Regions:
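Extracytosolic secretory-pathway proteins
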Residues: 1-181
Length: 181
């Protein structure tokens, strides 16, 4: 079994860069309602450890993540990896070996910078109070090749340093992820 998995899973230490593209992303901004945005950018993960439960897998650390969108209302909206070490490691779990099938669960902490916030002033920086969870439970290959990940629940966004003052919510984030070696 381990020999079969050996070819399926990336080795510890490997860094995997991917492009990200998410269209028609609904961002609820309290005073404006829902703004629809198209994000593009990238994410990079590093394989940190093996998972021994079930059929096995690996734990992944997000080491770079940034996507941005242009909005006529909000200007440039940028989602960037937050500079914190408390984000859980992401998971790549083997669901079956013949044929290969995987579930990837991505845990993300980030800031959202809105260039032209409603009400004026300089850029507004928001952060998520709890990690965003993106899942694809139907991967047939890893790294992903044009695979779509879905946000598991809406993400509340509040000003950095004021996590209870929610002013926006990321409602969905259907993101297509493609390995970009």
């Amino acid at each position: 079994m381990a020999a079969v998995l050996g070819g399926l899973l990336p080795p510890i230490g490997l860094e995997i860069p991917c492009s990200c593209y998410a269209v028609n992303v609904p961002l609820q901004v309290n005073v404006l309602g829902v703004i629809t945005l198209d994000f593009k950018g990238g994410i990079k993960v590093r394989v940190e450890a093996n998972i021994s439960d079930g059929l096995g897998g690996v734990k992944l650390k997000v080491i770079g993540h940034e996507v941005s969108a242009d909005s006529p209302v909000l200007g440039k909206v940028t989602i960037s990896q937050a500079d914190i070490d408390t984000t859980p490691l992401s998971l790549l779990e083997v669901l079956s070996t013949l044929p290969p099938s995987f579930r990837q669960t991505m845990f993300l902490d980030f800031t959202v910078t809105i260039e032209k916030p409603p009400g004026g002033g300089g850029p507004l920086v928001l952060s998520n109070a709890t990690p965003a969870v993106l899942v694809n439970d139907n991967l047939t290959v890893f790294p992903p090749q044009g695979s779509v990940y879905q946000l598991q629940q809406p993400v509340d966004l509040a000003p950095v340093g004021a996590p209870t003052q929610v002013v926006a919510q990321l409602l969905q984030f259907p993101v297509t992820v493609t390995h970009n070696p």
